[in-house]
């Protein structure tokens, strides 16, 4: 076992501290507005979700076994670097949720909402801690206390928190379950034991998403009028960010036996099917122009990275122009026709994928 790199200066912590359009962010919100939330319109289903969260089905699941003693240095260099990036990014996303949910719970008195965020912060802390223990075993743990104090926070109105975190939880479920099912079909590709934990792990993400779906369905105005435009924006932003990010890990997806486009289509399809429970609009992920636009965003992202490495006057000029091209491409993607969706009477779903 490698001695852990010291303090806030270790490489994993620096990776987690990065603030780019592609990295997980930390959020804060209007706590007084959160305190005024009312779930009476969805009370029956709300109580059922809360009963599941209260039961804490995964309280004994996140325990490492001797399998986790495997040295990451045994992996090929490119795969090791990309797997580490995957773990740090996942940890940052989980811990971001933990910090936000814990702060909401601390700052409000509404018993329904307070209990929800207590349970969700519990789960996210457990997930982040599990990943960090794996990193620590290999001397690359993230300093979570330093991260909490130093990471920049982005303010979002509650409705934007709902749109973004609902998608984050549900797409997290889709990502984990897709990898888990691939490992079921191809156990020879399981290069790390963490994947065996993904099935029950992703059920936590699914339950969290169910709670956010109910919060939105409890306030119908969040899902109507100009808010449909915001929903479309968040859908596109989350899908596009995921696509660009996944193509930055070719060795990781080659090891899984799933090309990034194939993986992304599966995740997008699951997420779209699930989001029918709450979103009145859906992206047309079967439109060839959608994938052409994602490819263009990916190429621009790669060009920005090359310009940064190039440096000098030309590199600086490119870094000024290329984000404008990315914004224009995103705008064109946003203008593609969306699909309308009639919301179902029964909101809750089961993780059946």
From Swiss-Prot:
The gene is acsF. Pathway: Porphyrin-containing compound metabolism; bacteriochlorophyll biosynthesis (light-independent). It catalyses: Mg-protoporphyrin IX 13-monomethyl ester + 3 NADPH + 3 O2 + 2 H(+) = 3,8-divinyl protochlorophyllide a + 3 NADP(+) + 5 H2O. One of its GO terms (biological process) is light-independent bacteriochlorophyll biosynthetic process. This is Aerobic magnesium-protoporphyrin IX monomethyl ester [oxidative] cyclase. Its EC number is 1.14.13.81. Keywords: Bacteriochlorophyll biosynthesis, Chlorophyll biosynthesis, Iron, Metal-binding, NADP, Oxidoreductase, Photosynthesis. Its cofactor is Fe cation. HAMAP family: AcsF (MF_01840). It comes from the Bacteria. GO terms for molecular function: iron ion binding; magnesium-protoporphyrin IX monomethyl ester (oxidative) cyclase activity. It holds the Pfam family Rubrerythrin. SUPFAM superfamilies: Ferritin-like. Catalyzes the formation of the isocyclic ring in chlorophyll biosynthesis. Mediates the cyclase reaction, which results in the formation of divinylprotochlorophyllide (Pchlide) characteristic of all chlorophylls from magnesium-protoporphyrin IX 13-monomethyl ester (MgPMME). InterPro entries: AcsF, Ferritin-like_SF, Rr_diiron-bd_dom.
């Amino acid at each position: 076992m490698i001695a852990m790199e010291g303090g806030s200066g270790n490489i994993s912590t620096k990776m987690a501290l990065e603030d780019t359009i592609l990295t997980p962010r930390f959020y804060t919100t209007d706590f007084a507005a959160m305190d005024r939330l009312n779930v009476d319109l969805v009370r029956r289903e709300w109580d059922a979700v809360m009963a599941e969260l209260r039961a804490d089905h995964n309280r004994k699941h996140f325990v490492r076994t001797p399998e986790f003693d495997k040295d990451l240095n045994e992996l090929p260099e490119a795969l090791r670097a990309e797997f580490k990036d995957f773990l740090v990014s996942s940890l940052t996303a989980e811990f971001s949720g933990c910090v936000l949910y814990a702060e909401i719970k601390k700052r409000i008195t509404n018993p329904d909402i307070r209990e929800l965020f207590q349970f969700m912060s519990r789960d996210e802390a457990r997930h982040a801690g599990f990943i960090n223990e794996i990193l620590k075993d290999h001397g690359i743990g993230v300093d979570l206390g330093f991260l909490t104090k130093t990471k920049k926070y982005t303010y979002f109105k509650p409705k934007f928190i709902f749109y973004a975190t609902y998608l984050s939880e549900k797409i997290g479920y889709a990502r984990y379950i897709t990898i888990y099912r691939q490992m079921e079909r191809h156990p020879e590709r399981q290069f790390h034991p963490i994947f065996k934990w993904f099935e029950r792990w992703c059920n936590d993400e699914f339950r969290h998403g169910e709670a956010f779906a109910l919060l939105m369905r409890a306030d119908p105005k969040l899902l109507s009028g100009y808010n449909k435009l915001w929903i479309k924006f968040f859908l596109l932003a989350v899908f596009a960010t995921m696509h660009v990010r996944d193509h930055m890990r070719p060795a990781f997806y080659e090891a899984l036996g799933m090309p990034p486009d194939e993986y992304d289509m599966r995740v997008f399809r699951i997420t779209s099917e699930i989001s029918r429970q709450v979103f009145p609009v859906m992206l047309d992920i079967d439109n060839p122009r959608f994938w052409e636009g994602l490819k263009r965003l990916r190429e621009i992202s790669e060009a920005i990275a090359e310009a940064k490495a190039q440096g000098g006057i030309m590199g600086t000029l490119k870094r000024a122009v290329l984000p404008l091209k990315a914004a224009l491409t995103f705008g064109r993607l946003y203008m593609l026709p969306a699909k309308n969706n009639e919301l179902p009477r029964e909101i809750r779903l089961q993780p059946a994928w």
